[in-house]
Protein backbone atom coordinates (compact mmCIF):
# COMPACT_ATOMS: atom_id res chain seq x y z
CA UNK A 1 0.00 0.00 0.00
CA UNK A 2 1.36 3.42 -0.89
CA UNK A 3 1.54 5.91 1.96
CA UNK A 4 -0.55 8.51 0.16
CA UNK A 5 -3.41 6.00 0.03
CA UNK A 6 -3.53 5.59 3.79
CA UNK A 7 -6.32 6.73 6.07
CA UNK A 8 -4.69 5.74 9.32
CA UNK A 9 -5.29 6.07 13.05
CA UNK A 10 -2.28 6.73 15.28
CA UNK A 11 -2.66 6.42 19.05
CA UNK A 12 -0.26 8.10 21.46
CA UNK A 13 0.27 10.72 18.77
CA UNK A 14 0.80 13.86 20.86
CA UNK A 15 4.55 13.46 21.21
CA UNK A 16 7.56 11.26 20.56
CA UNK A 17 7.32 8.47 18.04
CA UNK A 18 3.59 8.86 17.48
CA UNK A 19 3.94 12.52 16.52
CA UNK A 20 6.91 11.66 14.28
CA UNK A 21 4.88 8.99 12.48
CA UNK A 22 2.01 11.42 11.96
CA UNK A 23 4.28 14.06 10.43
CA UNK A 24 5.95 11.55 8.12
CA UNK A 25 2.60 10.26 6.90
CA UNK A 26 1.25 13.76 6.34
CA UNK A 27 4.39 14.60 4.37
CA UNK A 28 3.63 11.61 2.15
CA UNK A 29 0.06 12.72 1.51
CA UNK A 30 -1.76 10.37 3.88
CA UNK A 31 -4.70 11.22 6.09
CA UNK A 32 -4.10 10.70 9.81
CA UNK A 33 -6.50 10.55 12.74
CA UNK A 34 -4.26 11.32 15.71
CA UNK A 35 -5.42 10.46 19.21
CA UNK A 36 -3.93 11.00 22.67
CA UNK A 37 -4.97 12.04 26.17
CA UNK A 38 -2.69 15.08 25.84
CA UNK A 39 -4.75 17.64 23.94
CA UNK A 40 -2.06 20.35 24.02
CA UNK A 41 0.35 18.03 22.23
CA UNK A 42 -2.30 17.19 19.64
CA UNK A 43 -2.85 20.88 18.96
CA UNK A 44 0.89 21.36 18.47
CA UNK A 45 0.98 18.39 16.10
CA UNK A 46 -1.89 19.75 14.02
CA UNK A 47 -0.16 23.11 13.75
CA UNK A 48 3.17 21.51 12.79
CA UNK A 49 1.48 19.52 10.02
CA UNK A 50 -0.51 22.41 8.60
CA UNK A 51 0.29 22.93 4.92
CA UNK A 52 1.65 19.43 4.35
CA UNK A 53 0.31 17.33 1.44
CA UNK A 54 -1.71 15.12 3.78
CA UNK A 55 -4.04 16.05 6.60
CA UNK A 56 -3.89 15.38 10.33
CA UNK A 57 -7.19 15.23 12.22
CA UNK A 58 -6.92 15.29 16.01
CA UNK A 59 -9.16 14.26 18.88
CA UNK A 60 -8.65 13.36 22.53
CA UNK A 61 -8.46 9.60 23.09
CA UNK A 62 -8.07 7.46 26.19
CA UNK A 63 -7.45 3.95 24.87
CA UNK A 64 -8.17 2.45 28.31
CA UNK A 65 -11.81 3.52 27.89
CA UNK A 66 -13.87 1.16 25.72
CA UNK A 67 -16.39 3.91 25.05
CA UNK A 68 -13.64 6.34 24.02
CA UNK A 69 -12.14 3.79 21.64
CA UNK A 70 -15.44 3.07 19.92
CA UNK A 71 -16.31 6.74 19.56
CA UNK A 72 -12.83 7.64 18.30
CA UNK A 73 -12.75 4.97 15.60
CA UNK A 74 -16.23 5.95 14.43
CA UNK A 75 -15.15 9.61 14.31
CA UNK A 76 -11.91 8.79 12.49
CA UNK A 77 -13.76 6.80 9.84
CA UNK A 78 -16.05 9.75 9.20
CA UNK A 79 -13.37 12.44 9.35
CA UNK A 80 -11.13 10.67 6.83
CA UNK A 81 -13.88 9.24 4.64
CA UNK A 82 -12.70 5.71 5.31
CA UNK A 83 -10.18 3.74 7.29
CA UNK A 84 -7.43 1.37 6.18
CA UNK A 85 -4.67 1.63 8.77
CA UNK A 86 -3.84 1.65 12.49
CA UNK A 87 -0.56 2.37 14.26
CA UNK A 88 -1.09 1.12 17.80
CA UNK A 89 1.42 3.35 19.58
CA UNK A 90 -0.15 4.47 22.89
CA UNK A 91 1.65 3.19 25.97
CA UNK A 92 2.54 3.98 29.57
CA UNK A 93 5.10 2.86 32.16
CA UNK A 94 4.64 2.03 35.85
CA UNK A 95 7.99 0.40 36.52
CA UNK A 96 8.88 -1.41 39.71
CA UNK A 97 10.07 -4.79 40.97
CA UNK A 98 7.25 -7.25 41.56
CA UNK A 99 8.66 -7.96 45.04
CA UNK A 100 11.58 -6.17 46.69
CA UNK A 101 13.16 -5.52 50.06
CA UNK A 102 13.26 -1.89 51.19
CA UNK A 103 16.91 -0.89 51.54
CA UNK A 104 16.29 1.31 54.58
CA UNK A 105 13.72 -0.64 56.58
CA UNK A 106 14.16 -4.19 55.29
CA UNK A 107 10.40 -4.42 54.74
CA UNK A 108 9.07 -6.39 51.79
CA UNK A 109 7.40 -4.20 49.17
CA UNK A 110 5.11 -5.40 46.39
CA UNK A 111 4.19 -3.90 43.04
CA UNK A 112 0.76 -2.28 43.48
CA UNK A 113 -2.02 -4.05 41.61
CA UNK A 114 -3.21 -0.62 40.45
CA UNK A 115 0.09 -0.10 38.61
CA UNK A 116 -0.19 -3.51 36.94
CA UNK A 117 -3.78 -2.84 35.88
CA UNK A 118 -2.96 0.64 34.58
CA UNK A 119 -0.19 -0.64 32.29
CA UNK A 120 -2.20 -3.61 31.03
CA UNK A 121 -5.24 -1.38 30.57
CA UNK A 122 -3.44 0.92 28.15
CA UNK A 123 -0.70 -1.22 26.63
CA UNK A 124 -2.66 -4.42 26.08
CA UNK A 125 -6.41 -4.07 26.62
CA UNK A 126 -6.47 -0.62 25.03
CA UNK A 127 -4.35 -1.76 22.10
CA UNK A 128 -6.57 -4.81 21.63
CA UNK A 129 -9.75 -2.72 21.62
CA UNK A 130 -8.19 -0.40 19.04
CA UNK A 131 -7.46 -3.37 16.78
CA UNK A 132 -10.93 -4.83 17.29
CA UNK A 133 -12.82 -1.65 16.50
CA UNK A 134 -10.57 -0.56 13.61
CA UNK A 135 -10.59 -3.94 11.88
CA UNK A 136 -14.35 -4.22 12.38
CA UNK A 137 -14.77 -0.95 10.47
CA UNK A 138 -12.42 -2.12 7.72
CA UNK A 139 -14.26 -5.42 7.39
CA UNK A 140 -17.69 -3.78 7.30
CA UNK A 141 -16.52 -1.48 4.50
CA UNK A 142 -14.74 -4.26 2.62
CA UNK A 143 -11.51 -2.28 2.83
CA UNK A 144 -8.08 -3.89 2.73
CA UNK A 145 -5.89 -2.57 5.52
CA UNK A 146 -2.87 -2.84 7.77
CA UNK A 147 -2.24 -2.74 11.52
CA UNK A 148 1.14 -1.91 13.05
CA UNK A 149 1.51 -2.75 16.73
CA UNK A 150 4.28 -1.16 18.78
CA UNK A 151 5.82 -3.90 20.90
CA UNK A 152 9.23 -3.57 22.60
CA UNK A 153 12.47 -5.48 23.03
CA UNK A 154 11.40 -5.55 26.69
CA UNK A 155 9.37 -8.59 25.66
CA UNK A 156 12.63 -10.56 25.97
CA UNK A 157 12.54 -9.79 29.71
CA UNK A 158 13.53 -6.64 31.58
CA UNK A 159 14.07 -6.25 35.32
CA UNK A 160 11.53 -4.02 37.02
CA UNK A 161 9.04 -4.07 34.16
CA UNK A 162 6.75 -7.04 34.84
CA UNK A 163 3.60 -5.29 33.63
CA UNK A 164 5.24 -3.64 30.61
CA UNK A 165 6.93 -6.89 29.57
CA UNK A 166 3.66 -8.81 29.91
CA UNK A 167 1.78 -6.31 27.76
CA UNK A 168 4.41 -5.97 25.04
CA UNK A 169 4.97 -9.74 24.89
CA UNK A 170 1.25 -10.35 24.51
CA UNK A 171 1.01 -7.70 21.82
CA UNK A 172 3.79 -9.37 19.83
CA UNK A 173 2.13 -12.78 20.24
CA UNK A 174 -1.25 -11.45 19.16
CA UNK A 175 0.33 -9.80 16.13
CA UNK A 176 0.71 -13.34 14.78
CA UNK A 177 -2.72 -14.41 16.05
CA UNK A 178 -4.45 -11.45 14.44
CA UNK A 179 -2.52 -11.82 11.19
CA UNK A 180 -3.97 -15.33 10.94
CA UNK A 181 -7.46 -14.24 11.97
CA UNK A 182 -7.70 -11.21 9.69
CA UNK A 183 -6.10 -12.64 6.54
CA UNK A 184 -9.51 -13.57 5.13
CA UNK A 185 -10.63 -9.97 5.72
CA UNK A 186 -7.73 -8.54 3.70
CA UNK A 187 -6.04 -6.99 6.75
CA UNK A 188 -2.33 -7.49 7.47
CA UNK A 189 -0.82 -7.18 10.96
CA UNK A 190 2.81 -6.52 11.85
CA UNK A 191 4.72 -5.18 14.82
CA UNK A 192 7.83 -3.15 15.56
CA UNK A 193 9.82 -3.65 18.77
CA UNK A 194 11.94 -0.56 19.51
CA UNK A 195 15.00 -0.62 21.72
CA UNK A 196 16.26 2.45 23.57
CA UNK A 197 15.00 5.51 21.68
CA UNK A 198 16.00 9.15 22.19
CA UNK A 199 13.50 10.86 24.46
CA UNK A 200 13.55 13.86 26.82
CA UNK A 201 14.45 11.37 29.58
CA UNK A 202 17.49 9.95 27.79
CA UNK A 203 18.58 13.41 26.69
CA UNK A 204 18.56 14.50 30.33
CA UNK A 205 20.74 11.63 31.53
CA UNK A 206 24.15 12.41 32.99
CA UNK A 207 26.97 11.61 30.60
CA UNK A 208 28.31 8.68 32.62
CA UNK A 209 24.95 6.89 32.66
CA UNK A 210 24.41 7.65 28.98
CA UNK A 211 27.85 6.30 28.04
CA UNK A 212 27.17 3.08 29.97
CA UNK A 213 23.89 2.65 28.12
CA UNK A 214 25.39 3.26 24.70
CA UNK A 215 28.25 0.85 25.45
CA UNK A 216 25.71 -2.01 25.42
CA UNK A 217 24.32 -1.07 21.99
CA UNK A 218 26.40 -2.66 19.20
CA UNK A 219 25.79 0.17 16.71
CA UNK A 220 27.08 2.64 19.30
CA UNK A 221 24.17 5.04 19.68
CA UNK A 222 20.67 5.48 21.06
CA UNK A 223 17.95 5.19 18.43
CA UNK A 224 15.91 8.04 16.99
CA UNK A 225 12.19 8.09 16.14
CA UNK A 226 13.19 8.09 12.48
CA UNK A 227 14.84 4.68 12.94
CA UNK A 228 11.52 3.28 14.13
CA UNK A 229 9.59 5.09 11.41
CA UNK A 230 11.61 3.29 8.74
CA UNK A 231 10.41 -0.07 10.10
CA UNK A 232 6.83 1.15 10.44
CA UNK A 233 6.91 2.43 6.87
CA UNK A 234 8.16 -0.94 5.62
CA UNK A 235 5.22 -2.74 7.23
CA UNK A 236 2.73 -0.20 5.88
CA UNK A 237 4.07 -0.43 2.33
CA UNK A 238 5.07 -4.09 1.97
CA UNK A 239 1.91 -6.00 1.09
CA UNK A 240 3.74 -9.32 1.51
CA UNK A 241 4.75 -8.69 5.13
CA UNK A 242 2.44 -10.22 7.71
CA UNK A 243 2.42 -11.63 11.23
CA UNK A 244 5.95 -10.81 12.31
CA UNK A 245 7.66 -8.47 14.79
CA UNK A 246 10.73 -6.47 13.74
CA UNK A 247 13.27 -5.64 16.45
CA UNK A 248 14.80 -2.19 15.86
CA UNK A 249 17.30 -1.83 18.69
CA UNK A 250 20.77 -1.38 17.23
CA UNK A 251 21.50 -5.01 18.11
CA UNK A 252 20.90 -4.54 21.86
CA UNK A 253 18.84 -7.74 22.18
CA UNK A 254 21.23 -9.97 20.24
Q: Could you describe each region identified by the protein language model?
A:
Residues 2, 221-248, 253:
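C-terminal substrate-recognition "lid" of short-chain dehydrogenase/reductases
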Residues 3-33:
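Canonical Rossmann dinucleotide-binding motif of NAD(H)/NADP(H)-dependent dehydrogenases/reductases
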Residues 6, 81-83, 138-151, 184-187, ...:
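Active-site loop of short-chain dehydrogenase/reductase
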Residues 97-117, 213:
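Substrate-binding pocket helix/loop in short-chain dehydrogenase/reductase
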Residues 131-132, 176:
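A short, exposed helix-loop element centered on a Lys and neighboring polar residues
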